[in-house]
Amino acid sequence: MNQLGRDDFRAYSAGSHPQEHIHPLTEQLLCNYNIDTGILRSKSWQEFVLPESPQMDFIFTVCDQTAGELCPAWPGQPITAHWGFEDPAKAIGTDQERLKAFSRIYNEIGNRIRIFLSLPLHKLDRMSLQRQLNELGKN
């Protein structure tokens, strides 16, 4: 989102059950795309419910496991949608095969982000936008 959304969006990443470190294949994939991983760290989504947290307009959950989880009460009432993807960390095989799974999910997420960015956000009311984002999560 930070690369595709230019200056229109600032994206953050967090999880319900963060690991101690970013997955090594995630780092490798991002490095392959010349994305700086130096400032990235694994973090809990609870960091984004604190008073000093950045204001969120949209929150997309992406892990197939979070679909049934109780999400935090996000401050500011952002629009939320679930875009379920397979967890590439669960892929089995050689490192190359596993990296291919990470790459596939990276591309799938990128495709959804491109569609999101193509929506006429300033012309859609909140309910219409919510429907669009929910529908996007089904495809």
Residue spans for each PLM region:
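Conserved active-site segments centered on acidic
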Residues: 1-49
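Generic detector of well-ordered secondary structure
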Residues: 3, 32, 62, 110-111
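Short amphipathic alpha-helices and their capping/turn segments at secondary-structure boundaries
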Residues: 48-51, 69
